């Protein structure tokens, strides 16, 4: 397609967000999850309520939270006020100190009470290999799914060894693995493993927490060529590779900007240029050692 040069207006989107298919209860069954969602990491409860309300107004229909974020109640209030419960895909997570079968069941009930609505996707936040029990925790997720309390289950921050251990113990791979992934940390080997085993890849910190990535000359040159922002280029790069992304912001203009990524398509040349930015720079904790 012809590469645009005009600046994209930041307007409320009406185009439906593409979805990915998550494995549900049985092999061959799947549920649809929006490919672009809204994250609320490091956002307090009151600010999360306002940010989610704005995100819903803009057009987001997927929200990602967690018990440890301390903002499930604010997210729930925003969803209830918007009256979009049936239309929004909701994800939350069990924290490391709630690992174990019974503890996870109790943690799920507490999260659901704080959110005030059904949870679509429940994730193990970290494998916590030194202190946690991700196998027992995942068995609890399987029970919640079998009972119809949650539609799909998955994990976050699992490396290949963790995924193989989990599969050996419970007989299945998770539907999704939410991991740190951005142009400087592309996790190519893990992504290949995901593709081989039908695991959806979801990127947290998809923009690399801002900073160097959004000022990188490769990214800014592409942004200038397309008449969009650096953040929009990076989000588009993720989406064109089939990933789920959950950018975070509390600024209304940025919330809208991050959603306005469906009016252009990066060329293969641009995609290849971004692929060359991978330098193995991890910004968050190492899943092999992090225990929370």
Predicted segments — roles?
Residues 1-88, 140, 289-291:
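N-terminal binding-site loop/beta-alpha segment at the start of enzyme catalytic domains
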Residues 28, 76-87, 108-117, 145, ...:
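Acidic (Asp/Glu)-rich catalytic clusters
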Residues 36-46, 93-101, 127:
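Active-site mouth loops of central-metabolism enzymes
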Residues 44-56, 100-114, 163-164, 185-186:
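Short, acidic/polar
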Residues 60, 116-119, 150, 174:
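A structural motif
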Residues 86-99, 120-127, 157, 181:
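A short, structured active-site edge motif that brings together acidic residues
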Residues 97-139:
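Glycine/small-residue-rich loop that forms an oxyanion/phosphate-binding "nest" at active or ligand-binding sites
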Residues 127-292:
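Beta/alpha (TIM)-barrel catalytic core signal, keyed to glycine-rich beta->alpha loops juxtaposed to Asp/Glu
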């Amino acid at each position: 397609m012809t590469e645009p040069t005009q600046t994209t207006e930041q307007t409320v989107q009406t185009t439906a967000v593409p979805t990915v298919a998550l494995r549900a209860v049985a092999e061959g069954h799947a549920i649809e999850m929006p490919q672009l969602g809204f994250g609320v990491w490091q956002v307090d409860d009151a600010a999360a309520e306002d940010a989610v309300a704005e995100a819903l107004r803009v057009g987001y229909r997927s929200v990602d939270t967690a018990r440890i974020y301390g903002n499930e109640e604010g997210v729930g209030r925003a969803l209830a006020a918007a009256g979009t419960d049936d239309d929004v895909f909701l994800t939350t997570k069990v924290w490391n100190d709630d690992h174990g079968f019974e503890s996870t069941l109790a943690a799920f009930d507490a999260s659901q009470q704080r959110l005030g609505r059904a949870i679509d996707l429940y994730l193990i936040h970290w494998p916590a290999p030194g202190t946690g029990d991700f196998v027992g925790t995942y068995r609890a997720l399987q029970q919640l799914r079998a009972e119809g309390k949650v539609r799909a289950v998955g994990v976050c921050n699992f490396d290949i060894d963790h995924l193989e251990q989990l599969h050996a113990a419970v007989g299945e791979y998770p539907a999704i693995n939410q991991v740190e992934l951005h142009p400087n940390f592309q996790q190519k080997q893990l992504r290949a493993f995901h593709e081989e085993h039908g695991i959806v890849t979801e990127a947290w910190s998809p923009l690399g927490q801002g900073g160097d990535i959004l000022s990188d000359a490769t990214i800014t040159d592409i942004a200038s060529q397309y008449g969009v922002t650096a953040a929009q280029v990076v989000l588009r790069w993720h989406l064109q590779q089939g990933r789920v992304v959950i950018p975070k912001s509390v600024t209304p203009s940025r919330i809208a900007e991050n959603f306005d990524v469906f009016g252009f398509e990066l060329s293969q040349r641009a995609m290849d240029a971004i692929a060359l930015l991978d330098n193995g720079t991890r910004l968050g904790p190492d899943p092999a050692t992090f225990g929370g």
